[in-house]
Amino acid sequence: MRGLLVGRMQPFHRGHLQVIKSILEEVDELIICIGSAQLSHSIRDPFTAGERVMMLTKALSENGIPASRYYIIPVQDIECNALWVGHIKMLTPPFDRVYSGNPLVQRLFSEDGYEVTAPPLFYRDRYSGTEVRRRMLDDGDWRSLLPESVVEVIDEINGVERIKHLAKKEVSELGGIS
């Protein structure tokens, strides 16, 4: 059986890793769609799709998950929910089950006839992309929330400096002091 998981992964954190490990106990292969692939260089979406592919590939390898068990596919957003499932199906191998905690994603795939399962969330208050990015901006401990290989990717691309620089830009655009 092949499953599908869609997420922005901004950045890929330990909660994502636990969800993937849990899903891989139920399916033979997992398609991991990196959502909003066209977005980057903003506080909400600081990393490019390519950088997120690096994060996932390295983290899954670091945790002993064979590459033969998953596909990582960046997927750009489309602005029409009625066509979104078809868009995903066009870009991915066939799949049998969809894993999502997002009510809209659940609804769209269930209306298209797919079995949809809400994956367990692991310490959602701590393991969320929003919390990781907040800690990066506030010089907090963000590293402990991520697999070591993801920390290395973020260091390699100067990700924290990028987010802090973007925060200055966005404040100045709002008329604040930069």
From Swiss-Prot:
Catalytic activity as recorded in UniProt: beta-nicotinamide D-ribonucleotide + ATP + H(+) = diphosphate + NAD(+)
Keyword ATP-binding belongs to the record: yes
Gene Ontology CC: cytoplasm
GO BP term (any one): NAD biosynthetic process
UniProt KW keywords: ATP-binding, Cytoplasm, NAD, Nucleotide-binding, Nucleotidyltransferase, Pyridine nucleotide biosynthesis, Transferase
The protein's annotated pathway: Cofactor biosynthesis; NAD(+) biosynthesis; NAD(+) from nicotinamide D-ribonucleotide: step 1/1
EC main group: transferase
Gene Ontology molecular function terms on file: ATP binding; nicotinamide-nucleotide adenylyltransferase activity
Enzyme Commission number(s): 2.7.7.1
Claim: ATP-binding is one of the keywords in the record: yes
Subunit structure: Homohexamer.
Protein name (record): Nicotinamide-nucleotide adenylyltransferase
Species this protein is from: Methanothermobacter thermautotrophicus (strain ATCC 29096 / DSM 1053 / JCM 10044 / NBRC 100330 / Delta H) (Methanobacterium thermoautotrophicum)
